[in-house]
């Protein structure tokens, strides 16, 4: 399995913890490099790439979540619009009945 596939199987919380850990390691590597103590400078690039991969996965998840929320809002809006339209059609169809019942109530209240 590739690294990205393995990372995609982890939860978002685990990935965030890994991001924090990798940022700390990257900071440590940079300090060691500045002091000439880093024996394996390729670790900086590896860590940066891994960090970028994780951040990309987290961003994808965030965008997918936002898309799902937008779809849900659109669906509920369409559903609400359909319900309102159905109610308006019902009112138009029964307008005469409603007016008669209103007139009866008004007559009853006058007596």
From Swiss-Prot:
Residues 1-85 are annotated as: Large ribosomal subunit protein uL29. Pfam families: Ribosomal_L29 (PF00831). The keyword Membrane does not apply. GO terms for cellular component: cytosolic large ribosomal subunit. PROSITE patterns: RIBOSOMAL_L29 (PS00579). Belongs to the universal ribosomal protein uL29 family. This is Large ribosomal subunit protein uL29. It comes from Mycoplasma pneumoniae (strain ATCC 29342 / M129 / Subtype 1).
């Amino acid at each position: 399995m590739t690294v990205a596939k393995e990372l995609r199987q982890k939860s978002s919380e685990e990935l965030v913890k890994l991001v924090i850990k990798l940022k700390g390691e990257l900071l440590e590597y940079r300090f060691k490099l500045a002091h000439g103590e880093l024996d394996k400078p390729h670790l900086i690039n590896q860590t940066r790439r891994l960090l970028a991969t994780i951040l990309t996965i987290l961003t994808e998840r965030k965008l997918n979540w936002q898309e799902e929320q937008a779809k849900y809002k659109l669906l509920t809006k369409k559903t609400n619009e359909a319900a309102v339209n159905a109610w308006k059609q019902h009112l138009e169809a029964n307008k005469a009945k409603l007016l008669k019942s209103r007139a009866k109530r008004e007559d009853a209240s006058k007596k």
